[in-house]
Amino acid sequence: MLQLNKPLAFIDLETTGVNPGSDRIVEIAIIKVLPDGTKSVKRKLINPEVPIPQTASAVHGITNEMVKDAPTFKQVAHELRQMLDGSDLAGYNSNRFDIPLLMEEFLRVQVDFDMKGRRLVDVQNIFHKMEQRTLSAAYKFYCDKILEGAHGA
Protein backbone atom coordinates (compact mmCIF):
# COMPACT_ATOMS: atom_id res chain seq x y z
CA MET A 1 0.00 0.00 0.00
CA LEU A 2 1.26 3.45 -0.90
CA GLN A 3 1.84 5.68 2.15
CA LEU A 4 1.34 9.36 1.32
CA ASN A 5 2.29 12.40 3.38
CA LYS A 6 0.44 14.74 1.02
CA PRO A 7 -1.93 14.35 -1.93
CA LEU A 8 -0.62 12.73 -5.10
CA ALA A 9 -2.22 13.74 -8.40
CA PHE A 10 -1.80 11.42 -11.37
CA ILE A 11 -2.04 13.38 -14.61
CA ASP A 12 -2.60 12.21 -18.18
CA LEU A 13 -2.90 14.51 -21.18
CA GLU A 14 -3.98 14.06 -24.75
CA THR A 15 -2.66 16.81 -26.99
CA THR A 16 -2.38 18.31 -30.46
CA GLY A 17 1.17 16.95 -30.78
CA VAL A 18 4.35 16.03 -28.96
CA ASN A 19 6.02 19.43 -28.45
CA PRO A 20 5.45 20.66 -24.87
CA GLY A 21 6.40 24.20 -25.89
CA SER A 22 3.89 24.65 -28.69
CA ASP A 23 1.23 21.94 -28.62
CA ARG A 24 -2.03 22.19 -26.70
CA ILE A 25 -4.09 20.01 -24.40
CA VAL A 26 -7.27 18.47 -25.87
CA GLU A 27 -8.07 16.24 -22.88
CA ILE A 28 -6.89 16.09 -19.29
CA ALA A 29 -7.48 13.41 -16.70
CA ILE A 30 -6.48 13.81 -13.06
CA ILE A 31 -6.81 11.24 -10.30
CA LYS A 32 -5.98 12.83 -6.95
CA VAL A 33 -5.27 10.47 -4.05
CA LEU A 34 -5.32 11.93 -0.54
CA PRO A 35 -3.21 10.51 2.31
CA ASP A 36 -6.34 8.87 3.77
CA GLY A 37 -6.91 7.01 0.48
CA THR A 38 -9.81 9.19 -0.69
CA LYS A 39 -9.75 9.70 -4.47
CA SER A 40 -11.19 12.39 -6.68
CA VAL A 41 -11.27 12.23 -10.46
CA LYS A 42 -11.53 14.95 -13.06
CA ARG A 43 -11.61 14.34 -16.80
CA LYS A 44 -12.24 17.10 -19.32
CA LEU A 45 -12.15 17.64 -23.03
CA ILE A 46 -10.53 21.00 -23.76
CA ASN A 47 -10.85 23.17 -26.85
CA PRO A 48 -7.21 23.81 -27.83
CA GLU A 49 -8.17 26.88 -29.91
CA VAL A 50 -6.03 25.47 -32.72
CA PRO A 51 -6.86 22.67 -35.16
CA ILE A 52 -6.09 19.14 -33.98
CA PRO A 53 -3.86 17.52 -36.62
CA GLN A 54 -5.16 14.29 -38.16
CA THR A 55 -1.99 12.55 -36.95
CA ALA A 56 -2.84 13.42 -33.34
CA SER A 57 -6.51 12.44 -33.75
CA ALA A 58 -5.36 9.09 -35.14
CA VAL A 59 -3.49 8.44 -31.87
CA HIS A 60 -6.08 9.51 -29.27
CA GLY A 61 -9.33 9.59 -31.24
CA ILE A 62 -10.23 13.17 -30.26
CA THR A 63 -11.40 15.29 -33.17
CA ASN A 64 -11.98 18.99 -33.76
CA GLU A 65 -15.73 18.27 -33.77
CA MET A 66 -15.52 16.69 -30.31
CA VAL A 67 -13.86 19.75 -28.72
CA LYS A 68 -15.55 22.58 -30.62
CA ASP A 69 -17.95 23.31 -27.71
CA ALA A 70 -15.56 22.26 -24.92
CA PRO A 71 -14.12 24.90 -22.57
CA THR A 72 -10.73 26.39 -23.38
CA PHE A 73 -7.77 25.87 -21.07
CA LYS A 74 -8.15 29.46 -19.91
CA GLN A 75 -11.73 28.68 -18.83
CA VAL A 76 -10.69 25.67 -16.72
CA ALA A 77 -7.20 26.74 -15.58
CA HIS A 78 -8.22 27.97 -12.12
CA GLU A 79 -10.32 24.84 -11.48
CA LEU A 80 -7.41 22.59 -12.49
CA ARG A 81 -4.90 24.57 -10.44
CA GLN A 82 -7.18 24.34 -7.42
CA MET A 83 -7.45 20.56 -7.79
CA LEU A 84 -3.66 20.23 -8.09
CA ASP A 85 -2.76 22.68 -5.29
CA GLY A 86 -0.72 21.06 -2.53
CA SER A 87 -0.23 17.84 -4.49
CA ASP A 88 2.81 15.99 -5.67
CA LEU A 89 2.46 15.10 -9.35
CA ALA A 90 2.71 11.71 -11.05
CA GLY A 91 2.17 10.16 -14.45
CA TYR A 92 3.70 8.07 -17.20
CA ASN A 93 6.43 10.04 -19.02
CA SER A 94 5.06 13.00 -17.09
CA ASN A 95 8.40 14.62 -16.27
CA ARG A 96 9.32 14.93 -19.95
CA PHE A 97 5.90 15.60 -21.45
CA ASP A 98 2.71 16.02 -19.40
CA ILE A 99 4.05 18.33 -16.68
CA PRO A 100 6.07 20.62 -19.01
CA LEU A 101 3.09 20.91 -21.37
CA LEU A 102 0.71 21.60 -18.49
CA MET A 103 3.10 24.28 -17.20
CA GLU A 104 3.19 25.90 -20.66
CA GLU A 105 -0.61 26.00 -20.74
CA PHE A 106 -0.73 27.70 -17.33
CA LEU A 107 1.91 30.22 -18.46
CA ARG A 108 0.03 30.90 -21.70
CA VAL A 109 -3.11 31.92 -19.78
CA GLN A 110 -1.13 33.71 -17.04
CA VAL A 111 -2.28 31.46 -14.19
CA ASP A 112 0.38 30.93 -11.54
CA PHE A 113 1.11 27.27 -10.90
CA ASP A 114 3.90 26.96 -8.36
CA MET A 115 6.06 23.85 -8.63
CA LYS A 116 8.09 24.56 -5.46
CA GLY A 117 7.87 21.83 -2.86
CA ARG A 118 6.30 19.29 -5.20
CA ARG A 119 7.69 15.85 -5.75
CA LEU A 120 7.43 14.47 -9.26
CA VAL A 121 6.87 10.75 -9.75
CA ASP A 122 7.36 9.56 -13.31
CA VAL A 123 6.23 5.95 -13.45
CA GLN A 124 8.02 5.53 -16.79
CA ASN A 125 11.37 6.21 -15.10
CA ILE A 126 10.60 3.61 -12.45
CA PHE A 127 9.28 1.09 -14.92
CA HIS A 128 12.19 1.47 -17.37
CA LYS A 129 14.40 -0.11 -14.76
CA MET A 130 12.21 -3.20 -14.98
CA GLU A 131 10.49 -5.19 -17.75
CA GLN A 132 9.12 -3.99 -21.08
CA ARG A 133 9.09 -0.25 -21.50
CA THR A 134 5.56 0.48 -22.66
CA LEU A 135 2.44 1.95 -21.09
CA SER A 136 0.60 -1.33 -21.73
CA ALA A 137 3.28 -3.34 -19.93
CA ALA A 138 3.30 -0.88 -17.00
CA TYR A 139 -0.49 -1.08 -16.72
CA LYS A 140 -0.38 -4.89 -16.77
CA PHE A 141 2.38 -4.93 -14.14
CA TYR A 142 0.80 -2.45 -11.71
CA CYS A 143 -2.91 -3.12 -12.28
CA ASP A 144 -2.84 -6.75 -13.44
CA LYS A 145 -5.19 -5.85 -16.28
CA ILE A 146 -4.90 -5.52 -20.04
CA LEU A 147 -4.86 -1.87 -21.14
CA GLU A 148 -7.58 -0.92 -23.59
CA GLY A 149 -8.01 2.55 -25.06
CA ALA A 150 -4.46 3.65 -24.19
CA HIS A 151 -4.87 7.04 -25.81
CA GLY A 152 -7.90 8.32 -23.95
CA ALA A 153 -6.81 10.44 -20.96
Give each language-model segment a name:
Residues 115-127:
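A short, structured active-site edge motif that brings together acidic residues
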Residues 1-117, 132-150:
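Conserved non-catalytic scaffold segment of RNase H-like nuclease domains
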